[in-house]
Amino acid sequence: MRNETIIVNGKKLKWLFVERGFKIPSFNYTTTTEKVPGRPGTIKKARDLEGYEFDVPLIVRNDYLAGRKDHDDILNEVVKFFDYDEPVKLQFSNKKWYWNAYFDGPFEIVSNNDGFITFNVQVILTDPYKYAIDGNQNTAISDAVSVVNAGTAETPIIVEARALQNSNYYMISKGDEDYFMIGDDDLDKPLKDYSPLILEDEARSFSGWNKQNTIDFTDNQTGGKVGGSFIVSDSKQSFYLNNDSVSGNGWNGAMYKRSFSKQAQDFTTTVKFGINQKNKGAVRFAQYIYDSDNRVIASIGYTNPNAKQAIGTIIVTLFDQSGNQQTIYKYKNNPSLYKLDSFVVYIRLTRKDDVFTVKSWKYKEFPYPLRKKAFDEHERQFVDGGNFYQRPVVALSLYSAKNGSNNVMPLYIFGTYTRELLPRPINARDMIIKKGDLITIDMATKNVLVNEESFLSEKTFGSNYFNVDKGHTELVINPPGIFDTTVKWQDRFL
């Protein structure tokens, strides 16, 4: 029989094995009973599935075949292997399931360590379930989707729904009682799209964009000289700066401009771009908004000015009619991001009457079990008390720049989306879900995203997150004919 290795967060040490005879704990139910005088036997008060705390006995093979190591080398490798502040995947190499586990010490490793060495690692399971390594998914047909959970316990699901048309709500239900919904389905309320798109572009081609060779305003925060060019990525999913198209000292870059489908007074605009921090370098990015006189009225930018560090800052500014620039938002990335190789940045600027609202957040798909997560969210408002920034808006431009001969941090523009905001009557229903939107509902983490933005504020009162039972479950989607829905799940075991 082959020796069984231990796999932690997808990694293993080739010389570390599980000692034979280890008994895997399962089915950790405890029943609490109470004796009632005058009645035979007892009555059940509670039955609970408890967590686990147990030791896993491990063996270090320390010989010429595995490569000899001294005590400190072994200890340091083992500490790195198990040192996590969050629960991570714990798997045994001969099994087709994993736990989400914490690890505790102490590690007691003998100083004289030739041959085979034994020690224990303490495993803490606050989540008592085992999860199948291979996931499952099924696509809805005629607004119904079947889920077959081959495990021995109910399991949470992930719902992904692509809107084929605008909609005021999305609901997925299990039977007559369990359902989850975002939006408002009250038919007595008037329904209209109060935030129609006036520009949507996902950086797939330069069609509709005009390359700019001159610039008539000064942005000292995230701007610079123009004249360079963008490249469309091979995947046709982003624009990025052609570094060979610009030269000279200081900030030099490329700018492309595009008009809205109509002029707008109140508006909201969101820009989305990716940062590759693994390659250290300096970079600037900005999206500029233009008024009806073709003057810049706002900039939405990002800068990493130090070519040897990864400390980015989001900066949003407004321009008056004379071109004077005022910063209304400045937010440095949370230090927890400094060690990430890459992530996606979203910045949204909204003008409603005399109030400007800026919201930024980051997004990433984290490793297995794969979870989509929005994080480092931050929001701030600015009141235009003097009505200096109230001109109608008609166009925007995208700008990305490098600094002289310094290394460039790769920045990929993924898309820009601008909507006009129309007056909305009290209690009216809005088309909060637009054609093409991707809804993600994670029942395990209680996380709701629409286009990678947290959407928990739109969760309908009375709806709840739910699990699917072991065996077969039928789920129903409403409204009918509007969404292309896929449900993902992992079989779960006691």
Question: Positions of the model-derived regions?
Answer:
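Extracellular carbohydrate-recognition regions
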Residues: 150-152, 177-234, 410, 420
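Noncatalytic modules at the cell exterior or secretory-pathway interfaces
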Residues: 84-85, 159, 342-350, 383-401, ...
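Short, aromatic/His-centered strand-loop micro-motif at the edge of beta-sheets
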Residues: 315-346
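Extracellular/virion structural assembly segments
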Residues: 1-199, 276-283, 289-295, 417-494
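Secretory/extracellular carbohydrate-interaction modules
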Residues: 207-324
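Short tryptophan-centered beta-strand motifs in secreted/extracellular beta-sheet-rich domains
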Residues: 269-271, 338-370
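Flexible glycan-contacting loops in extracellular carbohydrate-active proteins
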Residues: 369-412
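Extracellular/lumenal carbohydrate-interaction signature centered on repeated Trp-anchored short motifs
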Residues: 257-269, 335-343, 466-468
